[in-house]
UniProtKB/Swiss-Prot annotation:
GO terms for cellular component: cytosolic large ribosomal subunit
InterPro entries, alphabetized: Ribosomal_bL35, Ribosomal_bL35-like, Ribosomal_bL35_CS, Ribosomal_bL35_sf
Entry keywords, A to Z: Ribonucleoprotein, Ribosomal protein
Identification of the protein by name: Large ribosomal subunit protein bL35
Source organism per UniProt: Nocardia farcinica (strain IFM 10152)
Region annotation Disordered: where it falls in the sequence: 1-41
Amino acid sequence: MPKMKSHSGASKRFKVSGKGKLLRQQANRRHLLEHKPSRRTRRLDGTEVVAAADVRRVKKLLGR
């Protein structure tokens, strides 16, 4: 049986932390930033933990 392939789109979007948590970037920080408040762009900085309802599905896509 060949190896399972991980979903390449999901592998670019999600990272697994050292403790096994799934991390993702926040949306709305790619473009059209000049009309968004600085407070909002700072708040959207950094990573966020994937919601508990989505963890099972994302792990399946990543082959974990």
